[in-house]
């Protein structure tokens, strides 16, 4: 026992002897130089300015939160901040008007992740590091879960931090402001980026923080440590999210900037074989002429013609409404369809319209138009709905616009009525009628009053759901979607028909995660490549693959599924449809492929208040191949386009889907 007592005393002596040495080590870390020492932040206010044309799209529940930065400290893209750490602020002005303002009260005892960042090799308590960040809440309760957080990590835009926007950088923090909480006055924190210009690395210079909250301004060298009671922290949109703005330039100067922007950032230059020098030589004179003549309409038409020259259906071309109306207001009272066998026939005939009065019958084959073979006339037409990614969609729109003319135009049509052996020719004058134009519209039947998701139980026992948009209210969309899934499971519905035929797209992430309700594995869906200034090349970050984040097991549906597609399924709609082809999860049913709009979009501003969009990211599958763009998603169950299907009374695509379910959902 005596020996033990001596040993214990010796150990105690060692520990007591070591304690002054440890305190001496801590004291060797210099104290941070504090400005505005009012005891530390209590409330933070600021404003959030945004220029992106998509910032508010689909947003119902915008949030300003304290964002735990442990994910960045660890360089962990999958880091999920806990609910307890999510201190939610108040938005204090109109969110839909930029800039909006916020106010955030700091908790007395925060619950973020502690990280030891003093780089001394010892294990210390560490500090809690926060950014102020904007998020939107879509799933679940008032806090952000994995899907709201896009799988985790840290904010790259609309935060108090300034992020390196080059995709190859790993989205390093390169400036901005942190709010740091130290549980005592013995914790170290960087006072600069060090020689490697990176934060939280071995070469960081370290200072010791006072206990409590300190605002760290990383835009100064060394960092500024501010203990103001009520600091003001604006959130940074970030170069990658901000809209390029050429609106204050002359027409020709704005065109030059636009061309250079397209040259570097446009996602499909090689895929589509675009020569930007050639486009500059072709279109710059139009902008110069419009500028010299101060001719606004000529300027708009120059932009229109430039955009129309790029075969990308995501691009929007402005045009003069009066010119458009004058060009298409004259109709012949008929619509056209092209059959699989190559014939172009009359699919709609207006009663007492010019075509019917002239003797043209329903199902008549149109052979010539204004003296040209119908195929040539169609191919030469430039639809007002241009441009297009898909040649198939362009052809369908050419069929629609080839028989639209100015009012009172004389039009010669060569046709062959059903049962006739000869081709007849007739000259008609166009009248102001839009029934035939509406009949051929991809959006026929839409009223604008549709919910983003509408579903019903069919008489045959299958469920039918139509997704109209991925750009409507995201929270409402998910609530309706999960309500449907619950009903499917509660009632043991064996088959589901998902109608995507009139969906213009929206959030690709929302589309991906809605498809996840039909899977049991967190599949990797692919990636995207964007322009990286530091590399002067497009780059795809392997650490940010797109994947399913699975809903709870009771919110998954395992029945047989068919997806109805068509040429008016665009962008995010196409990604949903593509996702449903993985593991052969659904049969894709349709007469045509989807629209072929695969690029990720951003907006830019031109003179005269014009805001346009263009494709800046390439969609890639899990193997790195470009998907969707130009080709779309093709049907796996192809419904023919022939006289029988064109003139069928019912919905032939829906009927084909039901037939598939009858064979496979028994």
Where do the model's predicted regions map?
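Bacterial N-terminal signal peptides that target proteins for export
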Residues: 1-7
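Bacterial N-terminal signal peptides
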Residues: 9-18
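Sec-dependent signal peptide cleavage junction
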Residues: 18-26
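Flexible, low-complexity junctional segments that flank or bridge functional domains
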Residues: 25-495, 502-504, 508-513, 520-526, ...
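Short, well-structured beta-strand/strand-turn elements
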Residues: 315, 570, 583-597
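Gly/Ser/Thr-rich loop/hinge elements
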Residues: 323, 327, 505-564, 598-606, ...
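Active-site-proximal beta-strand/loop segments in catalytic clefts of secreted hydrolases
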Residues: 349-350, 369-370, 466-470, 499-503, ...
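Low-complexity, Gly/Ser/Thr/Pro-rich intrinsically disordered linker/tail segments
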Residues: 633-666
């Amino acid at each position: 026992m005596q020996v033990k007592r001596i040993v214990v005393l010796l150990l105690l002596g060692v520990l007591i002897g070591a304690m002054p040495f440890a305190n001496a080590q801590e004291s060797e870390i210099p104290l941070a130089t504090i400005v505005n020492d009012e005891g530390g932040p209590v409330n933070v206010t600021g404003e959030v300015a945004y220029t992106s044309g998509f910032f508010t799209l689909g947003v119902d529940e915008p949030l300003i939160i304290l964002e735990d930065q442990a994910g960045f400290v660890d360089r962990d893209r999958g880091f999920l901040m806990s609910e307890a750490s999510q201190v939610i602020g108040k938005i204090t002005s109109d969110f839909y008007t930029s800039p909006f303002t916020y106010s955030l009260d700091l908790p007395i005892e925060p619950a973020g992740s502690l990280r030891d960042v003093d780089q001394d090799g010892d294990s210390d308590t560490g500090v809690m590091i926060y950014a102020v960040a904007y998020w939107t809440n879509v799933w679940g309760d008032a806090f952000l879960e994995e899907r709201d957080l896009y799988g985790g990590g840290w904010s790259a835009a609309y935060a108090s931090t300034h992020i390196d926007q080059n995709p190859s950088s790993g989205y390093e923090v390169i400036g901005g402001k942190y709010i740091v909480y130290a549980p005592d006055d013995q914790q170290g924190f960087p006072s600069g980026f060090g020689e490697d210009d990176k934060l939280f690395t071995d070469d960081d210079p370290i200072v010791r923080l006072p206990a409590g909250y300190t605002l760290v301004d990383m835009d100064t060298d060394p960092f500024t440590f501010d203990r103001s009671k009520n600091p003001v922290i604006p959130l940074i949109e970030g170069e990658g999210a901000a809209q390029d703005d050429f609106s204050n330039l002359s027409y020709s100067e704005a065109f030059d900037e636009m061309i250079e922007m397209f040259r570097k950032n446009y996602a499909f230059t090689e895929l589509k074989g675009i020569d930007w020098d050639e486009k500059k030589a072709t279109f710059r004179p139009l902008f110069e002429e419009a500028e010299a003549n101060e001719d606004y309409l000529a300027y708009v038409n120059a932009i229109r013609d430039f955009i129309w020259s790029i075969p990308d259906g995501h691009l929007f071309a402005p045009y003069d409404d009066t010119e458009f109306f004058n060009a298409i207001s004259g109709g012949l009272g008929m619509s056209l369809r092209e059959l699989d066998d190559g014939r172009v026939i009359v699919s709609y005939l207006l009663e007492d319209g010019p075509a019917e009065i002239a003797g043209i019958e329903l199902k008549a084959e149109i052979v010539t138009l204004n003296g040209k073979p119908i195929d040539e006339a169609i191919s030469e037409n430039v639809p007002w709905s241009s441009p297009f990614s898909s040649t198939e969609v362009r052809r369908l729109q050419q069929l629609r616009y080839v028989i639209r003319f100015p009012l009172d135009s004389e039009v010669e049509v060569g046709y062959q009525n059903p049962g006739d052996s000869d081709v007849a020719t007739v000259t008609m004058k166009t009248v102001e009628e839009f029934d035939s134009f509406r009949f051929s519209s991809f959006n026929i039947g839409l009223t604008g009053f549709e919910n983003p998701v509408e579903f019903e139980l069919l008489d045959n026992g299958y469920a039918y759901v139509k997704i109209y948009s991925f750009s409507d209210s995201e929270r409402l969309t998910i609530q309706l979607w999960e309500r449907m899934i619950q009903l499917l499971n509660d009632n043991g519905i064996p088959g589901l028909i998902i109608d995507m035929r009139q969906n213009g797209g929206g959030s690709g992430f929302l589309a991906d995660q809605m498809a996840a309700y039909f899977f049991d594995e967190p599949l990797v869906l692919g990636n995207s490549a964007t322009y990286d200034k530091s590399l002067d090349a497009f780059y795809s970050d392997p650490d940010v693959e797109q994947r399913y984040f699975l809903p709870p097991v009771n919110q998954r549906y395992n029945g047989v599924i068919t997806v109805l597609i068509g040429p008016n399924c665009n962008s995010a709609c196409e990604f949903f449809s593509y996702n449903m082809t993985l593991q052969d999860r659904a049969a894709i049913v349709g007469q045509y492929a989807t629209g072929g709009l695969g690029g990720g979009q951003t907006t830019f501003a031109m003179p005269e208040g014009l805001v346009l969009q263009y494709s800046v990211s390439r969609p890639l599958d899990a193997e790195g191949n470009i998907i969707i763009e130009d080709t779309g998603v093709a049907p796996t169950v192809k419904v023919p386009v022939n006289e029988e299907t064109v003139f069928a009374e019912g919905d032939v695509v829906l009927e084909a889907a039901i037939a598939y379910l009858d064979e496979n959902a028994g």
